[in-house]
Amino acid sequence: MTLQEIKEFLLGVTLNTFHQEAWEQPDTYIVWQEDGESDAVHGDNKKLVQILDVTIDVYTKEEYPEIITRLQNAFNDKGIPFELLSIQYESDTKYTHYEYLIQAVV
């Protein structure tokens, strides 16, 4: 999955999707960002394929957020391996923050 495909995929889950920083903060939104290289394929002294870790952060003020079910079902429907890294309540903003990890091929 490319970075553009990740963007389009997340926009299919919610239009409140932002890359790197949310300039709006509705009650529920997603911010995604590339984190760094997790793997690569080399040949003839060149990098042929680069795999990036991509963090997807979901912020919501809902107690039992439907967006989490929608996102995880969408991951499974598209065959995208994912890992839920953490769930944290942020008392200063009143958001619950879900952090996912997926990979992108660049």
Say what each PLM segment does.
Residues 20, 81-87:
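Conserved short beta-strand edge segments in small beta-sheet-based binding/regulatory domains
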Residues 61-63, 105:
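Helix N-cap motif at beta-to-alpha junctions
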